[in-house]
Every structure is written in structure tokens, then in C-alpha cells.
């Protein structure tokens, strides 16, 4: 005899487009699915906007309070949303940067300005890096077209670079690496995928 339930899955890829995310989630709700899994911030936000009754699970979400624009955060959403987070221990990463680059003075942070989770990470780790004695400056790009130029600006003015967990940066590691390696500037990444593509550590 078979044990358990027969499950069917409907996997849709919005390719990072917010309007496509909304269309997909509306279809899921219309089809009265039992669960919705939102992978990354845009998908979670679209799912949250589409239903307050179907249970939603989030994954690849750095900070739920930021993603869901919740000012009163107690560790749970208080609604039909739960899930996992990929937020790195930013205080420990700042200490690791100090261990790896003790002689550095200026740290540049590169991230996509349209990703709320990246803004949150940059703001948070900046405080920890300043506590370690670094001068920190943010270098933001709006989309993948600006990545190389922004990386060059960061490399020109920084002794080392930090890149938080950032979807756009993760998809542009080759372009980032091409610039940073030419400039001989080390990159500390917020997560393993970016570290493999263009970083020296995470």
C-alpha cells in the first residue's frame, strides 16, 4: 500500500519580474491551491498581496519585516506567511572582514538599489564595519546594465568590497569579477553563490 498523499506541483518562473509574479500568484489563488511557495522577495510580496487565506511559505528571504514592510516585528508575521531566511550573521561577517583585511581602511558595499533586503543588509553591516574602524561607502546599481561601472567606482575608492545577499549581484558575478580582479580588490560576499562567482570569502 502507498503511504501519504498524492501531491501535484505547479512551478512557475517569473524571471524576477514583479508584474509576472503578481499574475502567477493570482492564477494560483484562482486555482484554489493549498499552499503557495514564494522564492525570493518579489514572489513573496506578490503572494502576500494576492491572498490572506492560503498559507504562504517564503524562501530565499533575507528579512521578512523588510520584505513585507512590517514596522512592528516580533519574529512572526502574524498572518498567513511563514518560511525560512537566508540572512547572514552580519556582525560575524564584519569581524571576519577585519581578520582578513586588517590594514584596509575603506570598504565599499555594492548592491542593487531596488532590492529592499540588500538595503537592509547594507545599513546593518555598515554599523558593524564602522565599529571595526572602517570607513564605509555604498555603491548602488539599479539593474544589471550598471554593474560594471558601479563596481569600477567602488574599486577605485575602496580597499576591499562587500556584497550582501543580492539577487542581481548574484546574476552578475562574472561582470563584477572582471572589474575587481583587474583592480586587484578583494570581495567579501554575503553568501556562498556570490563568493564562488567573484569573492574571496563569505
PLM regions with names:
Residues 2-21, 80, 126-144:
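Short beta-strand elements in bilobed, periplasmic/extracellular small-molecule ligand-binding domains
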Residues 20-23, 27, 31, 42, ...:
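Extracytoplasmic/secreted proteins, especially bacterial periplasmic and envelope-associated proteins
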